[in-house]
Structures are given as structure tokens and as C-alpha cells.
Amino acid sequence: MTPRKKLEGLVAATVTPMTPDGRINLSVIHQYVDYLVSEQNVKNIFVNGTTGEGLSLSIQERKQLAEEWMCQGKGKLDHVIIHVGALSLLESQELARHAAAIGASGIAVIAPSFFKPTNKDELLGFLQKVASEAPTVPFYYYHIPAMTGVKIRVEELLDGIREQIPTFQGVKFSDTDLLDLAQCINKKEREQFVFLYGVDEQLLSALAIGANGAVGSTYNYLGRKTNLMLQAFAKPDLALARKYQFLTGEFLSFVIKLGFGVAQTKAVMTSISGIPMGPPRLPLVGASEEFIAKAKAKLESIVWPDGD
């Protein structure tokens, strides 16, 4: 992995492969890496996040997954970002130390979601305690208020953040509040921090206001198409970029109506990649055969601008 190369473009939020009986399946991660790189043209990953069921895994499982992704990604991936957030500060710190020890490109932390921070200082205090355990590793805040219930605006959080967290590098911004994102980018500018958008169906809007790239689950299987959208946006050919975004949105709108989450993402990924991702961990339950058939048919029916 290229050290300290700027993180931009697409980052696949990886799913966690599991065996039929619910254990993590490390044996397919080498195939997974090769698939992302060769088939999807995605060379950055975000491990043990929401899509990876990170908070449903044990600390030992999270360490094993981080190690395997680092091992299999060596020489193939540009960035391996390890999510180390947890409800327990001590566990989050342990995971941060481990990520640093194995050479992770960066660490990310989600806000605690049971006993929640209620203001900027409380949240910053938690983040600082975790970041300090990996003092040479780039640190990212993972903002996803729909899941955590922590709605502290990122614009507010970033004010003076480098004084508390010298390694602070940017934000995984998984919220639809584009005003908050825009104010962050306007005040901090792209050169200082990295802003990676996390709502796949709205990526083009985020790019328009200055996001550096994106972290998302669809880039596991629609990475190549989304990269073409990024290329069109950069030309700029906005009409072509919109076509890609609208078609991604058409697929997501379809599956969301059927019921779409991590379990269904694993099923779609299995179907498209041919790599067995296995079931989710309870309380999530596996996708139905009906869902899998309908989702596959819908995706195959889409006519992309590149003709593939």
C-alpha cells in the first residue's frame, strides 16, 4: 500500500464474509481484493464499518479481519482504512493500537450510540482519546447520525479539531445534510481535510460541492460504473455523469422498496462477484430468494451509457 497517498476517489465499504454457520470467513478475502481491483477498479477499502457489521463482531474478529485485509491487500490496495469505533472507549483504543501496529493507512471512529455524546466537547473528548492511541495514523471521523442518533454538526466539530487531534485527516460523511457538508468544505477547503461522502445515491451532488470522493457499499459491485461517473464529472460532462447517477439511483430505489440493508448487500455481492459472502449476523437475517432474483434481474436490465 502506498503510504500517505491522499485518500480520494472511491472507497469500498467492505462486507464481512461469513460461513453458513456465522463465523467470519477469512479464506475468501484474497478473492475479494482481486475482484475489487480487477473487476471494479477500486483500490481503497473501509473495513469493519456499518456494511462490514463491525459493531456485531467481537474485538478478536475485528482484529483478524483487519490483519487479513492488510495482508491480502499488500501491493494491490492503496488505502486500507480500519474502523475502530466501539461503544467501549477501551475497546476502541485497543483496536486503534492494533490498526497502528499492522500498518493501517488510517483509522475511523463512529460516535458511541448507546450512551451518546450530547455536544461537541463530549464527542471530541471520545475521539481524541482513541486517536491518541495511534499517534502516527491518519484519523477520520465517521459521521452517520441515522445510525448513531448523534446529530452534532460536522461543521461545528471541525472547528479547531487539529488542536485536539493532530492526526485528524477528514470525515466519512454519511448523512444527507449537504448544507453541513458544504459549510465544512467551504470553511476548511479540500486541501486541508478529506471529505468522503457516504450516501451513494447522492454522490454526484456531493461532488458538485467539493467532496473528494466516497465510501459506500455499492462500490463493491458498481465501482467501475461509479468511477466512470467520476471521470465524466471531472471532464466535465455533467450530462453523462447524471446518467450514471440516475441509473445507480434507479437500482437503489428499486431494492430499497423491497427492503435493502447489509444482509441484502451481501446477497447482491455474492450474486455479482461469485464470491460467497455468507449470511449476516443476528439480529440481521439473510435476504430472501425472491429479493435476490428481483435485484439481479433489475441490475441486469439496466443499460449503462458505456454499453456494458
From Swiss-Prot:
InterPro entries: Aldolase_TIM, DapA-like
Pathway: Amino-sugar metabolism; N-acetylneuraminate degradation
GO biological process: N-acetylneuraminate catabolic process
Residues of the active site: 142 (proton donor), 172 (schiff-base intermediate with substrate)
GO cellular component entries: cytoplasm
Any coiled-coil regions, as ranges: none
EC number: 4.1.3.3
Quaternary structure, from the entry: Homotetramer.
Full protein name: N-acetylneuraminate lyase
Task of the protein: Catalyzes the cleavage of N-acetylneuraminic acid (sialic acid) to form pyruvate and N-acetylmannosamine via a Schiff base intermediate. It prevents sialic acids from being recycled and returning to the cell surface. Involved in the N-glycolylneuraminic acid (Neu5Gc) degradation pathway.
Positions that bind aceneuramate: 50-51, 174, 198, 200-201, 217
A GO molecular-function annotation: N-acetylneuraminate lyase activity
Keyword Lyase annotated: yes
Catalysed reaction, written as an equation: aceneuramate = aldehydo-N-acetyl-D-mannosamine + pyruvate
Family per record: Belongs to the DapA family. NanA subfamily.
Origin: domain of life: Eukaryota
Subcellular location: Cytoplasm
Naturally occurring in which organism (per UniProt): Gallus gallus
This protein's UniProt keywords: Carbohydrate metabolism, Cytoplasm, Lyase, Schiff base
Family annotation (PANTHER family): DIHYDRODIPICOLINATE SYNTHASE, N-ACETYLNEURAMINATE LYASE
